[in-house]
Design a protein with these regions (language model features):
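Conserved phosphoryl-transfer catalytic core
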Residues: 68, 77-92
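Short alpha-helical scaffolding segments that buttress acidic/His motifs in well-ordered protein cores
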Residues: 109-113, 127-134, 178, 182, ...
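Amphipathic alpha-helical packing segments from all-alpha helical-bundle domains
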Residues: 104, 125, 137-163
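Helix-turn-helix
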Residues: 2, 26, 34-68, 72-76
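Hydrophobic alpha-helical connector segments
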Residues: 86-123, 175
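Residue-level detector of well-ordered alpha-helical segments, enriched
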Residues: 73, 101, 105, 109, ...
């Protein structure tokens, strides 16, 4: 059956057994899990509502469409992640009279997504969703990824202040390379590294992994 529901179905709020807020939350959580595990194209509206245990019309009623639901999850989760980063950066600035060192700036950038990705963290599914959305998302998501850099501007400014001898161009390039570290260091990929190293690199400790990443990134930034 197509994901396009009829106008009449769209107009009906399927409230049996659920109040509207609970239904919307159930749809959101189910969609996030399924998109994270299967990918966007492999999940239908019927899959989402079955997982959530709600009426088929719920997705369109509360979010408008599957695409709009995907964007809402992406917007909310990236917003939460970037607010956590901003909070850590602000705290680092407070500790250092407005001029935190490179390592603490990078820690504010790295630590939130790394901690979310910990297999023991309930937030892990949100990171998995964000990763999927970055590679499989809609044109609207791709547009945000390309053009919404406001959350990175504060890091660039802090790094320029911490490295006054570096040309601004170099600061931006080095920040770009540091973002690559974040995007490519996920627990799911460590089995490959462990195989490559003959068992020397097994890492399940977020704190230890964060320290390794910061050692590398700080040295690169200050080189």
């Amino acid at each position: 059956m197509s994901d396009n529901l009829t106008h009449d179905a769209d107009a009906m709020e399927p409230a049996e057994g659920h109040d509207q807020a609970a239904t919307k939350a159930a749809v959101f959580a189910a969609a996030e899990r399924l998109f994270a595990l299967r990918g966007f194209q492999n999940v239908s509206v019927r899959d989402i509502t079955a997982e959530a245990g709600v009426n088929l019309a719920s997705v369109n009623y509360h979010f408008g469409s599957k695409d709009a639901l995907l964007f809402e999850i992406f917007r909310r989760r990236t917003g939460e992640l970037n607010r956590e980063r901003a909070r850590m950066l602000h705290e680092a600035a407070d500790r250092h009279a407005g001029a935190p060192p490179v390592r603490e700036i990078l820690e504010a950038l790295f630590a939130p997504p790394l901690r979310w990705a910990d297999p023991a963290n309930a937030r892990r599914v949100s990171v998995q969703f964000i990763i999927r959305a970055r590679s499989e998302g809609t044109e609207e998501i791709r547009d945000v990824l390309q053009n919404d850099v406001s959350h990175l501007e504060r890091f660039a400014e802090a790094l320029k202040k911490a490295c006054p001898a570096l040309p601004p161009e170099s600061v931006y390039w080095r920040l770009h390379f540091c973002l690559g570290l974040v995007h490519n260091n996920r627990f799911v990929e460590f089995d490959r590294l462990n195989h490559l190293s003959g068992g020397l690199t097994r890492e399940g400790d977020v704190t230890a992994l964060l320290s390794r990443m910061l050692d590398f990134a700080e040295a690169g930034f200050l080189a």
